[in-house]
């Protein structure tokens, strides 16, 4: 049902500073009790290796399978780690990767297009999802500039290029992590709100299933009112999904969210 009129979904984000599976499971249960997690249950891992990723995926799908929950899991490690884990038998849901609007920017993330091609092929063969859309991308204004990979273009133009790349792979979901770049590129709450609405608009124009991580870093000129205001604006504008984090405070990524 994600993306249909009147549906506002959420990614459940049960991160833990130690990748402790008991903590992750407890956060999953809490989030589900609020109806959060219909877009994806996605963990940002501390340790990016196949064994840890498989352990966390097993935890996520242990809950999904026990209660027959109509959602999908994801561990947001590097795309190559996810591919290897799934090929070794880990339960596959969505395959994730952060993307950038230039080849140089992708290389800064350690990514080549061939990896995304392989991820789509592996997802089509192994992933436990109902449809064909098996990829999950994250973006955000300023990433290309911070990597010196914008070639003189402004951050909105570079962000628009992200959505063109994402559309090529027909992903299940895409979201901007709008304030995570910090005040060096989006200084305060007004700039973050503007960027969130810009990204939503560009994503929708690109025809992709667009969401937004309404967030800010602790050194930005912003507070939790920003996240709530942007969340309401995006819901009114038809955004597909946002994030769900315990108390809006991600203890692993060290930023403030919804």
Name every feature range the model reports, one short phrase each.
Residues 1-25, 33, 38-258:
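Anaerobic metallocofactor- and corrinoid-dependent redox/one-carbon enzyme cores
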